Amino acid sequence: MEMTNAQRLLLSNQYKMMSMLDPENAERYRRLQTIIERGFGLQLRELDRDFGELPEETCRSIIDIMEMHHALQVSYNNLKDRQDIDARRLEFLGFDAATEARYLSYVRFLVNTEGRYTHFDCGSHGFNAQTKMWDKYLRMLAVWHACPRQYHLSAVEIMQILNA
């Protein structure tokens, strides 16, 4: 992260104020203040992650993924014959915190801050699937988008999406 001295001073002051306003997180803010003031390059990269950018297209894809899971659950609940579909496979697992942290962060924002998809079970890991999911979800989306009635899926369509 490249910052001028003036920008570093402003950010340092912000962290100082935050440490006073939020005593529970004061230690974290003081640490960040020190990193900014001293310009520790390695630790400044942490801030890059905090201030990363998630393009609009990616945000829309994540919402689409979550909407697909909602449609899977609604369709499953409306089925008369569930044909051995394991309901656990319908759950939205989230994303891998180690490799897909930006996606995971957006999911948590949507659920916890925006109040969307609050009916999804975040599990004990808070939507951390602990394995890469992005490519799997994109394959599932391709199949879901090809379905003529996306919110009234048959058991066969549900299985095709899950097995994508």
Curated annotation (Swiss-Prot):
HAMAP family: UPF0304. This is UPF0304 protein NT01EI_2691. Signal peptide: none annotated. It comes from Edwardsiella ictaluri (strain 93-146). InterPro entries: UPF0304_YfbU, YfbU_alpha-helical_sf, YfbU_helix-hairpin_sf. Belongs to the UPF0304 family.
